Amino acid sequence: MTKHIIVIGGGLGGISAAIRMAQSGYSVSLYEQNTHIGGKVNRHESDGFGFDLGPSILTMPYIFEKLFEYSKKQMSDYVTIKRLPHQWRSFFPDGTTIDLYEGIKETGQHNAILSKQDIEELQNYLNYTRRIDRITEKGYFNYGLDTLSQIIKFHGPLNALINYDYVHTMQQAIDKRISNPYLRQMLGYFIKYVGSSSYDAPAVLSMLFHMQQEQGLWYVEGGIHHLANALEKLAREEGVTIHTGARVDNIKTYQRRVTGVRLDTGEFVKADYIISNMEVIPTYKYLIHLDTQRLNKLEREFEPASSGYVMHLGVACQYPQLAHHNFFFTENAYLNYQQVFHEKVLPDDPTIYLVNTNKTDHTQAPVGYENIKVLPHIPYIQDQPFTTEDYAKFRDKILDKLEKMGLTDLRKHIIYEDVWTPEDIEKNYRSNRGAIYGVVADKKKNKGFKFPKESQYFENLYFVGGSVNPGGGMPMVTLSGQQVADKINAREAKNRK
């Protein structure tokens, strides 16, 4: 008899797992509480402006392409992606700007401010991150390794210690090789992909720089939601039964097994395996009602990553100095990280990520206007949450900073505004305390590891998404779905022997 897989949540991890399980011959049912597939890969359109509500950067497209190739299909027949050789522009408080290009040579050619020594150091750092990326790919990505002990067993103790560089934090690894203060801050903020602090995260995450340099930075034409739509279409073609507007209220358990799910309609659906794309702690807390002692232990080790204050602005003017992707950096990177990740307060001078897709795709705003998405990282929801007044003051702080750093009269030109707070993120995606990136990467707390993909409490329960390895970001959560499918396939093959 064909075994039945239930997938809870249609984010990229969930839809990826569903596709691979269906491709492997299982009966698959996916339940998504929202009316769209893609999770945080969401879309907002109003007054002629289009915004990607969630991720705005596509990297490592080969991970997505593999899903189509398993079905002997081409992703290019489903969605169009465009490479962006000019990856982003960095603005600094003293007026300095640095343009990051795909390729160290190209970055040097486009930035007269960078010296020969700067470029040599940048190349040296890229070589260092390449070594980490290569060894990470062998075990962490290709075999879905989940713990430090698995890493050590796979690679050997000395090889793992040296090549994963578990001695240093990410920022220490950067500062050891880079002397230019602007480059130090820019490279440190690659940690944005996982919503953590470069001063706390292990140096292994330096590989994020090499990933982007080698694999490129891409734009999904028409908006990144088209990628989720493509995956949904592939899933349906492979026979996945997708239920949207369907909320799972409870996971039924018996001893050390999960037996099925109870929907908000009261219907019970049996399962041989359950794959949860809901974050690990909310799954245990709200769907399984795990005891407080075990929950508290998990919460101490796997703290949420950062959230964000997300502004979607329709602007009745154009700012020619903006690139597609932009970063407006803080005066004091260390203080910014401290306030967000340790003091848990709204930062005084946040680093701001600003996306202006209209620079590449003119269909995203009316002629002569621009669509601007603004995202500074802020703490996840605290026991005493920030108030409406707190957020209003923070909004003013953001706009003050952007105007001061060159976006003249931005306030006057805003004709449309939509804002998402951590509370909105938690409500819409059931994320843990409104975190955007799952679990924080912290060298001391968890060695940079997220939750394992296999439940430690229930033998046929698996997890995908940003709260499990290999981590947050679109390619990683998509890869987690493929890795879980591989684990279930391997287990079933072993059972048949």
UniProtKB/Swiss-Prot annotation:
Instruction: State the Gene3D superfamilies in the record.
Output: FAD/NAD(P)-binding domain
* Cysteine disulfide links: none
Catalytic activity reads:
all-trans-4,4'-diaponeurosporene + 2 AH2 + 2 O2 = 4,4'-diaponeurosporenal + 2 A + 3 H2O
- Domain of life of the native organism: Bacteria
Q: What is its EC number?
A: 1.14.99.-
Q: Which GO terms describe its biological process?
A: carotenoid biosynthetic process
Q: In which pathway does it act?
A: Carotenoid biosynthesis; staphyloxanthin biosynthesis; staphyloxanthin from farnesyl diphosphate: step 3/5
* Entry binding sites for FAD: 7-19
Q: Name one GO molecular function term.
A: oxidoreductase activity
Tagged with keyword DNA repair? no
Does Flavoprotein appear among the keywords?
A: yes
- List keywords of the entry alphabetically: Carotenoid biosynthesis, FAD, Flavoprotein, Oxidoreductase, Virulence
Main EC class the enzyme belongs to: oxidoreductase
What InterPro entries does the record tag this protein with? Amino_oxidase (IPR002937), Carotenoid/retinoid_OxRdtase (IPR014105), FAD/NAD-bd_sf (IPR036188)
Functional summary from the UniProt entry: Involved in the biosynthesis of the yellow-orange carotenoid staphyloxanthin, which plays a role in the virulence via its protective function against oxidative stress. Catalyzes the oxidation of the terminal methyl side group of 4,4'-diaponeurosporene to form 4,4'-diaponeurosporen-4-al.
Tell me the NCBIfam families matching this sequence. Answer: crtI_fam
* PANTHER family, A to Z: 4,4'-DIAPONEUROSPORENE OXYGENASE (PTHR43734:SF7), PHYTOENE DESATURASE (PTHR43734)
Q: What's this protein's family per the entry?
A: Belongs to the carotenoid/retinoid oxidoreductase family. CrtP subfamily.
Full protein name? 4,4'-diaponeurosporene oxygenase
The gene name reads: crtP
